[in-house]
């Protein structure tokens, strides 16, 4: 996987994470990542991006991103806020048609994880 941002674990403890990974239309990963990066400042008003990657081998048309939230209520609030943000909605109009498959996994760190 190739990183597209500096891995940025959140400050403090007690976080949960959402790992989202998408399979995109053949050849569209670069364009999708460009649109995503342009819209990211608007999305980060609601929650913090920890990492953004794309695959280089295996499935070359996949992107992955990891988000941190203090709890599930904060996740719901962030997603609701972003869904009303005009700039984020504009990204969804551009990036959405490129998606072929979307997956989301909620992760809770173990008590020995550095990402608590």
What are these model-derived regions, one by one?
Residues 1-116:
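Short S/T/G/P-rich N-terminal loop/turn motif that feeds into the first structured element of a domain
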